[in-house]
């Protein structure tokens, strides 16, 4: 069974690149402070790498 990750957007997307905005939209992160839970996959890890300076990631219980 794969683990789940809690992902929280803690910085805005105003000065971000189109690639970063697209990754945030795909994850469902559209407002500062929004938290989503996603299954940990290699594709998700790639999106998180693009947004690494804008988000915090924790393992969900």
Swiss-Prot record:
Keyword line: Ribonucleoprotein, Ribosomal protein
GO CC term (a single one): large ribosomal subunit
SUPFAM superfamilies: Ribosomal protein L30p/L7e
GO molecular function: structural constituent of ribosome
Domain of life: Bacteria
GO BP, sorted A to Z: translation
Family of the protein in this entry: Belongs to the universal ribosomal protein uL30 family.
Subunit structure, interactors included: Part of the 50S ribosomal subunit.
Protein name: Large ribosomal subunit protein uL30
UniProt gene name: rpmD
């Amino acid at each position: 069974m794969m683990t789940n990750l809690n992902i929280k957007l803690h910085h805005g997307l105003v000065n971000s690149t189109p690639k970063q905005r697209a990754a945030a939209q795909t994850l469902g992160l559209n407002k500062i402070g929004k938290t989503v839970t996603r299954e940990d996959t290699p594709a998700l890890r790639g999106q998180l790498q693009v947004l690494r300076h804008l988000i915090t990631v924790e393992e969900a219980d």
